[in-house]
């Protein structure tokens, strides 16, 4: 569960290393974001020479959460960390590589480009 002020690792090669959630998209009073939800975030830590700089405001999709999520078949999925992938306005990733596994929920929410770039879908 991601909410305002949550810090997430960035799981792509855009140059950002850490982002801070400033808004969960999808309703005026929506509080939490899970796997596959889009957030607005600011870049808190970035490497020099990357596509994004520290202080940039970006859109990102959550790909891993430490809070367990119940699936329709009764199983639960959780990860060791909270992570996101920075996206463009058309929901395509800004980077060309994705690091680490991503949740299967991304396929249901039509983030097919991220699913195809990911090394593993859990």
Curated annotation (Swiss-Prot):
SUPFAM superfamilies for the chain: Ribosomal protein L14
Database matches in InterPro entries: Ribosomal_uL14, Ribosomal_uL14_bac-type, Ribosomal_uL14_CS, Ribosomal_uL14_sf
GO terms of molecular function: large ribosomal subunit rRNA binding; structural constituent of ribosome
Annotated SMART domains: Ribosomal_L14
One Pfam short name: Ribosomal_L14
Complex and partners: Part of the 50S ribosomal subunit. Forms a cluster with proteins L3 and L19. In the 70S ribosome, L14 and L19 interact and together make contacts with the 16S rRNA in bridges B5 and B8.
Main function: Binds to 23S rRNA. Forms part of two intersubunit bridges in the 70S ribosome.
Protein name, UniProt field: Large ribosomal subunit protein uL14
Organism of origin: Mycolicibacterium vanbaalenii (strain DSM 7251 / JCM 13017 / BCRC 16820 / KCTC 9966 / NRRL B-24157 / PYR-1)
């Amino acid at each position: 569960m991601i909410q305002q002020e949550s810090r997430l690792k960035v799981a792509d090669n855009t140059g950002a290393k850490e982002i801070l959630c400033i808004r969960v998209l999808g309703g005026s009073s929506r509080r939490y974001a899970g796997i596959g939800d889009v957030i607005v975030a600011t870049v808190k830590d970035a490497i020099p020479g990357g596509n994004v700089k520290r202080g940039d405001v970006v859109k990102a999709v959550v790909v891993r959460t430490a809070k367990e999520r119940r699936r329709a078949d009764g199983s639960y999925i959780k990860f060791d960390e909270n992570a996101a992938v920075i996206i463009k306005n058309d929901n395509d990733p800004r980077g060309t590589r994705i690091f680490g596994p991503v949740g299967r929920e991304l396929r249901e929410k039509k983030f097919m480009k991220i699913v195809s770039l990911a090394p593993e879908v859990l």
